[in-house]
Design a protein with these regions (language model features):
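Helix-start (N-cap) detector for alpha-helical repeat units in TPR-like alpha-solenoids
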Residues: 7, 11-14, 48-49, 89-90, ...
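Extracytoplasmic/secreted proteins, especially bacterial periplasmic and envelope-associated proteins
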Residues: 9, 13, 20, 32-36, ...
């Protein structure tokens, strides 16, 4: 009988082969890969890459097949990902991205990005995403506030310096 590590290694190798190692990817490969990721997560629920790749594949299936059931499935697993991995910025950031890009809801995206930046290890790119979501949702004042907050943590960040200048200029009005 295989131990946990051997099973994970075999599952990941199979996923890699199906996803990247097959020249002519078959249409049915994504559902197979999704099921393999589910098996990986049964063995390793803290595997951020497996969660994020599986959710991305579900979103891709929703787009490619024009089948919203995949999108609802992706949302269900995105919420489960966060519930099982609440410590650290990464899951919050990913769910923010999910609601920003995959299942557009800027209010929810803002909420999750706000949670992500509370973590000290959140990279500057997470702050950039929050600023962009605020700006895109028409909340210029909030975007300005988050620029200032970002500059307090990352004082020389060129994106944020320029974004703040733009938002407070006549052009940004």
């Amino acid at each position: 009988m295989q131990d946990r590590e051997q099973k994970l290694k075999l599952l990941n190798k199979t996923i890699e082969t199906l996803w990247h190692g097959v020249k002519d990817s078959k249409e049915g490969d994504y559902p197979k890969i999704i099921n393999l990721y589910k098996e990986v997560l049964k063995l390793d629920a803290k595997n951020n890459d497996a969660w994020e790749n599986m959710i991305w594949l579900m979103w891709s299936m929703a787009i490619n097949k024009k089948d919203t059931s995949w999108l609802f499935e992706a949302e269900k697993f995105a919420k489960r990902y966060l519930a099982l991995n609440p410590n650290g910025y990464r899951a919050y950031e990913y769910i923010g991205q999910f609601y920003r890009v995959m299942y557009p809801d800027l209010k929810l995206a803002t909420r999750y990005y706000e949670s992500a930046i509370r973590w000290k290890d959140a990279p500057v790119s997470t702050h950039h995403s929050l600023i962009a979501v605020c700006e895109n949702s028409g909340d210029k004042l909030r975007a300005i506030d988050y620029c200032k907050l970002t500059l307090a943590r990352f004082p020389k960040d060129p994106y944020t310096v320029n974004k703040l200048k733009f938002l407070t200029s006549k052009e940004g009005n």
